[in-house]
Amino acid sequence: MTLASSDPSAGATWPGRVLVVAAVVASGLLIVGPALRRRYPAAWWLLLGYPASAFRVARTWRALMAGCGLAVSRRPALTVVSGLVGNGAPPPQPRVPRHGFIRPTAAGFELVARLLPGQLPDDFVKAAPAMAEDWQVHAVRVTSLRPGVVRIAALYADPLAAPRAPRTRGPGRLLRVVVGTLETGASWVIDLRRIPHWLIVGATRSGKSTLIHALVAGLAPQRVALVGIDCKGGMELSLYGPRLSALATDRAQAVRLLSALVNLTLDRMTVCRTAGVRNIWGLAEKERPVPVVVIVDEIAELFLVAGRHEKDEAHAAGTALIRLAQLGAALGVFLVVAGQRVGSDLGPGVTALRAQLGGRVCHRVADPGTAEMTLGDLNPDALKAAQAITPEQAGTAVLASGDGWERGRSHLVTETDAEAVATAHAHLTPALPELSAALV
């Protein structure tokens, strides 16, 4: 009987072929990498950027932890003499925090690390710049996930360099607007149902007006009433004139308009109480009053005083704003207060109003006191980040709330764009005669 013979080299060719194919694919990806990154950055990141970054993290983790003082000796009580321990054994390797799976994200990657005994999340926060340098990424952000565990998020590029405006597909969810891009690459969303009142500050050419343009452009297609208070003669908010149900252009008009808004809010309270519901969202849709978004530009103009009469007006305006902030969320009245400068020197009413505005946005400001007033009571880290914004970073801001803080940049909506959007949706402007009468 003759046995069939096989060539042992035939099976050995398969590993070689696999290596050749892998080499060809890798070479091709490296060649087309620059073009792929420009045209399809997400695909480039998953195919090339993420694998290289994950390998870099795994390779440098132990040395990085030791260099940043995050390694702990296994036997600290031993005396080391001339690099030897005990009977000539080399010193034991120090313990380093363990990290989990390096998970890719749209803007980079993230991983969790378990702290060693005696370590704090702040120790990792201080090491974030070194991590970014060693891993060759744009930035690293460290947050506490739960006791003993931190989340380390890395960004391979700056998503705020050129944020892309979303494609408009209709009005979207009521009172929810995508106004820009966050540092994480996610959309920057202002949701007035979740955080009803906002304080937005920023110096000239900081991006404050652009953010307001983006917010109004997103609210204009929705079935809401927009009310403006612009005590600089209406120079800013008059762009949205066709879409505004009312616009006050000086402090006397503002006081009357705010008083009418308080009365409107109290009337809605009576309606809700009669219907046995806690807010307007509990009313039937046909009975529900239209939500009102009040935009106040340059809040300092309401509070600056030069005489007794102006002091009374400023006090009345401040009191009305505080009442709207306290009562408005449940009754469909929302505040967006903006200004170049906000400080306690404007009067106690400003501090009391600030406490009622849960959402804060701080662009580049001209004085540290404004940043302190905006963010200081929420998060000291957010305050430091806001003070680091440079004039070249127009549109970049730090946004903070009770949930934490993030950096973001608003989409570019020009004055021409804002005016066009307001005109296109002028037919959605609800008539509120009680507010119009206050301006006469």
Task: Name every feature range the model reports, one short phrase each.
Residues 1-12, 70, 80, 84-90, ...:
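Actinobacteria-biased recognition of intrinsically disordered, low-complexity terminal regions
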Residues 1-49, 167-275, 289-372, 380-383:
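P-loop NTPase catalytic phosphate-binding loop
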Residues 45-171, 175-178, 185-186, 344:
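N-terminal "pre-motor" subdomain/linker immediately upstream of P-loop NTPase catalytic cores
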Residues 119-121, 160-162, 198, 302, ...:
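Residue-level signal for secondary-structure boundary sites
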Residues 129-130, 141-144, 150, 156-169, ...:
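Conserved ATP-driven motor cores of ASCE-family P-loop NTPases powering translocation/secretion/packaging/pilus
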Residues 144-147, 198, 204, 210-216, ...:
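A short, charged
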Residues 146-154, 276-289, 340-342:
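Glycine/charge-rich, flexible interdomain linkers and switch-proximal surface loops
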